Amino acid sequence: MMPFRTQPDALVPNYNLSVQDVYTDTARILMTSHGTLSLLSHVEDPSHRRIPNLPSWVPDYSVVQDPYALQYRGPCYWKASGNLTWSPNILTMANGELEVTGYHLDTIDKTSTLQTELEDPSAFWATIVKLASTLELPYPDPGNSNETPGRIELLWRTLTTNTYNRTYPAPSEIGSLFIDYILNLQIRHRLTPWSSSDEFQPHHSPLSESVYPDWRTLFRLEPPESPYSWDRYRKRLAMVVESMFDGTYSPIGLAQLQHEFDQGSGSRRRLFKTKGGYIGTGARSLGKGDEVWILHGGSVPFILRPQHDGYHSLIGESFVYGVMHGEVQSLSLPRRQVTIL
């Protein structure tokens, strides 16, 4: 591992140093030897940190990393900052301050809940559907890709970090798989079994509308020609129900999609929307008012939280649909110097 392969004395044991100093020195040496900000993707969620008074940009090596960094989702080769490089300030890093250069892409204004924060699994999806329904179209296209994804496509591609079975970008046919996934969710949520001690309830509806995902509204927002239109969804629903009665339907193909959701979102990462209409997924602890930054030398966007006197703290890495390959350079955003504590 760099730099220890070529510089075996890069870290010298010093038992007079505190744990915080040892971790900070390790992070500084790893980052300066690589010349990138890739180590920031290995910083765990703030809620999982055990070592107190550790700079927010320094990983807490005493905890297990969960989730793994986005780079392990597959051979994605994200390069959010394009060819822009990071110039380290070794002196300030030794004092716990990380100086970076970058672009404030946008500010988070809406977030979803996590599976672990709600008792009812349908309520988890209700917050996701509600967030997706607020997306304005056309979606921002800083890379001039001329693509015009609808809200449902934006949703599933973001929840999976646009990756399926280690393939990036995810094949378009995964959209059809997502439709079947939604159908299975609705059947499971609406037909939740009642207690065996209860009598038959022909109009049993265990969920209040406030926690039930409003998929119908989301589908009806799609144009008629969309593969995710309301009419196509209803036809697929009829086909699935018929195949269930025939005994020919098997949802086993949804297992891989569930795995992608578990890794890209679920209980591990929180879905968010920005004021400017971007959708993304990031650290559990992100919240309204946090900022999305593209930093020189960073392969993915990062979530920073403004602190006192213009400083920032690192919340974690993120996936933001549409800005993962250097598109930020075409936005004419002001380049800023930021210090992360």
Model-derived regions: residue spans:
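Acidic/Ser/Thr/Pro-rich low-complexity tail/linker regions in eukaryotic proteins
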Residues: 2-341
